[in-house]
Amino acid sequence: SPQGLLRLVSHLPALAKLPVVFHVETPQALHAHVLQLRHSGISMVYSSGEPRETEAYALFAHILAAKTHTGALHFFDTVSANNLPSTQASLLQVPLAPEPSELSDVTINGIFSDVNERLGTDIQPLRVLGAHATDTVAVMLGAETTKLSAYVPIVSLHLVRPLSARCLVDSIPTSVKRVAVLEH
């Protein structure tokens, strides 16, 4: 549970240096407890709870941990267990890298490509939703992104940590003058 993670706070810096993955369901899209762990050194991956997306980001977290020898936290909104897809075991057999890879944009983009190829998905570190011709954009994560994108463009985060500044800046249209960061 998200509250249970708070008991691990003192251990997370050490766990961040090990290839471990935590999967945490965030009921009712309440991310406050999970987001308190941003400064722990552990990578953080978010998925909205759509079963196929949740499966893909979970696999991304495992490959990230295996290739970089770093800990990862995959948190996702509540999903119905009956709707979860069944991933073949062969997809999850990712050997530990003999030498840890540097946690760089190149490594991360390679892992996203690997997962998309294996599962036939199109997951990304972030996604821009809604209209692009505006002077305001909101950056956020959560299930509400789809609803709000009808009013203002939304940059929906999926790779919360490490957050690529280059990727974030490149995703914002040049017409934008104001950026709102929405956190709940």
Predicted ranges, named:
Residues S10, A14-K17, H39, A56-T70, ...:
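Generic secondary-structure signature for well-ordered alpha-helical cores
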Residues V21-H23, L37-I42, E102-G110, R127-D135:
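Gly-rich Lys/Arg/Thr-decorated short loops/hinges at beta-loop-alpha junctions or inter-strand turns
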Residues S1-H33, H39, M44-A65, R118-H184:
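Thiamine diphosphate
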Residues V21-E25, S47-S48, L73-D77, M140-L141, ...:
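Short beta-strand segments
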Residues H69-V128:
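Conformationally flexible catalytic loops at phosphate/diphosphate-handling active centers
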Residues S1-L5, P51-E53, V79-A81, M140-K147, ...:
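Gly/Ser/Thr-rich loops at beta-strand to alpha-helix junctions
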Residues Q28-R38, S171-I172:
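Flexible glycine/proline-rich, aromatic-decorated loop/lid segments
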